[in-house]
């Protein structure tokens, strides 16, 4: 039984899908005007884990994450670079796939784009106007916020409280300061589309509502995104979607916490803005992912090199213990009476599932993984090992790896199994037999230069990535 924290109700709830065995999930994606920063990477990783765990529990997950390819930031970037908005969007969509692919984020079921849904957006807005929920004014179209009775229910703010901070900017023609834009009148030199309201382009909030409706229907199971999107973006999505669809927009709302850099808010003005495109050249993407899930998704996370190094060390411990188990598999036998280890492994797996069932607590799931590694390290020191126990260890390691999306071997691990490396190890073994220790040391140093560390053990030579 999976429970998750629902921002809408401010409490944990048992997950009950609309359709048995299926999860319809919409995650707000990036505005594709630049490479993604690590703040964008966090929801991509966290909700990828949520998806993976649902799939592990037997659900079919329809995972939709959009690209915002029409936006003020894109238009500004196109003017700066003297390139078209579609050209810039294509470049950074490709970069996004490359970056999150490096972080082992699975491809979405669908990645809808605003430009591909322009006719749908225009019709959606027209429907809202026809029903009295929206109005045209000065070439713009606004949503009539006070007409929607549930406005403020996600952010838990009354409409009167919201009114206090609202204002009408110069050039806006709103009936009420709380009303928000559905359609923006075209400005000279900006990309625009023809519509019944005149030339223009959609507002940000309406884009997600329409893409979610088109891809997943009037009501979805889970809508997710960063905490910064809770208001006004997700609040406005609810208002326009439920006014249009006459149905709840999403049954569960999930929001991940912020990322700070050395205990400061990440911002360009502070010079601590970290792009994934840059950081994965310095930090192993697997380590970055492991670091991101080492904290519960709803909690803020502090990024600094010391904490990343701690994550690297922790992941290395897990991988080294798995390598030891793989090596012992070569000499394991079918001995019996090792039920104690089987029971302990099962207990760790049960604990992993328990904490993941409790609002996807990856921090505690990693603790369970450490405990599995500790038990594995103890087991390989036994005089005799059982094939059954070894296989059980390997199976549970693989479950943890698949659910958390962290590979059991580094992306360079295949190099350790390369035919040339194996031949060098064999040659070194032969040199030692022949007492040619100079050659044996030479081969050892050669492999070390490739980050391959050899260790002589009673069970033979084993190697690991340094």
From Swiss-Prot:
Chain ranges for the short sequence motif 'KMSKS' region as given in the UniProt record: 265-269
InterPro entries xrefs: Cys-tRNA-ligase (IPR015803), Cys-tRNA-synt_Ia_DALR (IPR015273), Cys-tRNA/MSH_ligase (IPR024909), CysS_C (IPR056411), Rossmann-like_a/b/a_fold (IPR014729), tRNA-synt_1_cat_dom (IPR032678), tRNAsynth_Ia_anticodon-bd (IPR009080)
Pfam families xref list: CysS_C (PF23493), DALR_2 (PF09190), tRNA-synt_1e (PF01406)
PANTHER family per UniProt: CYSTEINE--TRNA LIGASE, CYTOPLASMIC (PTHR10890:SF3), CYSTEINYL-TRNA SYNTHETASE (PTHR10890)
Required cofactor(s): Zn(2+)
Keyword presence, Heme: no
Record-stated family: Belongs to the class-I aminoacyl-tRNA synthetase family.
Positions annotated to bind Zn(2+): 28, 208, 233, 237
Any GO MF annotation of the entry: ATP binding
Protein name: Cysteine--tRNA ligase
Record's cofactor remark: Binds 1 zinc ion per subunit.
Subcellular location as annotated: Cytoplasm
Gene: cysS
């Amino acid at each position: 039984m999976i429970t998750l924290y629902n921002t809408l109700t401010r409490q944990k709830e048992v997950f009950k899908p609309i359709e048995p065995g299926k999860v319809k999930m919409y995650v707000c994606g990036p505005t594709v005007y630049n490479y993604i920063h690590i703040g964008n990477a966090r929801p991509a990783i966290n909700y990828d884990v949520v998806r993976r765990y649902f799939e592990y529990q037997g659900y079919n997950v329809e995972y939709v994450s959009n690209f915002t390819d029409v936006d003020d930031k894109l238009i500004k970037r196109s003017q700066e670079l003297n390139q078209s908005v579609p050209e810039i969007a294509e470049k950074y969509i490709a970069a996004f796939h490359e970056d999150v692919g490096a972080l082992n984020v699975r491809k979405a079921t669908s990645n809808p784009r605003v430009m591909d849904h322009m006719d749908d957006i225009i019709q959606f807005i027209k429907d809202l106007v026809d029903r009295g929920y929206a109005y045209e004014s000065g070439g713009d179209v606004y949503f009539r916020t006070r007409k929607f009775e549930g406005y403020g229910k996600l952010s838990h703010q009354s409409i009167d409280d919201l009114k206090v901070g609202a204002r009408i900017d110069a050039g806006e023609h709103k009936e009420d300061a709380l009303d928000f834009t559905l359609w923006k009148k075209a400005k000279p030199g900006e990309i625009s589309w023809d519509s019944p309201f005149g030339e223009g382009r959609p507002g940000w909030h309406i884009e997600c509502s329409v893409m979610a409706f088109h891809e997943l229907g009037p009501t979805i199971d889970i809508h997710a995104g960063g905490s910064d999107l809770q208001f006004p973006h997700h609040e406005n999505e609810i208002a326009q979607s439920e006014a249009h669809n006459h149905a709840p927009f999403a049954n569960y709302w999930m929001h991940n916490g912020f990322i700070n850099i050395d205990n400061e808010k990440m911002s360009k003005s502070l010079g601590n803005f970290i792009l994934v495109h840059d950081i994965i050249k310095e930090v192993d993407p697997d380590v970055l992912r492991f670091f991101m899930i080492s904290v519960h998704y709803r909690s803020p996370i502090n990024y600094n090199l010391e904490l990343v190094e701690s994550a690297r060390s922790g992941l290395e411990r897990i991988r080294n213990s798995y390598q030891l188990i793989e090596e012992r598999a070569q000499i394991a036998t079918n001995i019996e009476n090792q039920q104690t280890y089987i029971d302990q492994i099962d207990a760790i797996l049960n604990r992993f599932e328990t904490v993941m069932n409790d609002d996807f607590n990856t921090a505690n799931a990693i603790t369970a993984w450490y405990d599995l590694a500790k038990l594995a390290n103890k087991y390989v020191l036994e005089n005799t090992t059982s094939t059954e126990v070894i296989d059980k260890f390997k199976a549970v390691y693989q479950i943890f790896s698949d659910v958390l999306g962290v590979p059991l071997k580094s992306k360079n691990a295949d190099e350790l199994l390369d035919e040339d490396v194996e031949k060098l190890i064999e040659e070194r073994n032969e040199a030692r037999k022949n007492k040619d220790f100079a050659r044996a040391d030479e081969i050892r140093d050669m492999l070390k230069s490739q980050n391959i560390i050899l260790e002589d053990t009673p069970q033979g030579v084993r190697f690991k990535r340094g």
